[in-house]
Curated annotation (Swiss-Prot):
Family indicated by similarity: Belongs to the DmpD/TodF/XylF esterase family.
Lineage of producing organism: Bacteria, Pseudomonadati, Pseudomonadota, Gammaproteobacteria, Pseudomonadales
Entry-linked SUPFAM superfamilies: alpha/beta-Hydrolases
Keyword presence, Cell inner membrane: no
Chain segments annotated as transmembrane: none
Purpose of the protein: Alkaloid degradation.
Superkingdom of the organism of origin: Bacteria
UniProt-recorded Gene Ontology molecular function terms: monoacylglycerol lipase activity; tropinesterase activity
Binding partners and assembly: Homodimer.
Protein name stated in the entry: Tropinesterase
Native source organism of the sequence: Pseudomonas putida
Substrates-to-products reaction catalysed: atropine + H2O = tropate + tropine + H(+)
Amino acid sequence: EIIPVPDQAAWNASKKSIQINDAIKMRYVEWGNPSGDPVLLLHGYTDTSRAFSSLAPFLSKDKRYLALDLRGHGGTSIPKCCYYVSDFAEDVSDFIDKMGLHNTTVIGHSMGSMTAGVLASIHPDKVSRLVLISTALKTGPVLEWVYDTVLQKDFPLDDPSEFAKEWVAAPGKHDNGMAKNLKTEELAVPKHVWLSAARGFSIINWTAASKYLTAKTLILWGNQNQPMTESMQNDIRAALPKAKFIQYNGFGHSMFWEDPEMVAKDLNEFLK
């Protein structure tokens, strides 16, 4: 029995939860074929599983899709500490164990892609296929700017998009229902999570770790992407020479919001 993709209104109500370790009860949305190979979807900085909601209907129906809320985001536990990429990655590793998943594909966007890459490098046995959307081995100056700006803000935020347009308000033809709901969920992310995750990014450089990665890998990048530059793509392609690389001309950081059908076509081809 295929599990349907929840619509925008039902997205949060459809979340399931599982205690993955002492600190974290993780919330996730599941759709697709429950007996298919698992595909985990990891969202970006201050997003939630909803980031994949407009892409979901275009993905092939034969896989079991699990879109996670990472720690501190969405409905998942919000510990005081810690929010390094390795913490997100170990949570996903614990989720894979607790759910008893095998032959797992991990798709990550932005922060989620770095999480996916670190997971596949540190636990190569747990990830059979890897998709890195708008990724990098280390982050650039955009994050310092976000950090400095968040530091001066009063929380709760009333509108993050005035300063975090790069992340929050990806320009394009994205699903307005998804964008509106996602913005509300981003506003709910506590200040310590915004700041801790941003500090965590500043220490990440998984170039050396990437040599342990064995998963078949696909990298997706839009050439209008401001946070993740072309030189960052050259670096990761040098580190992962076997990876397939697809460039979307005229698309930005969240190209799967701008044209979900286009991106789903490439994902479905890779997941075959």
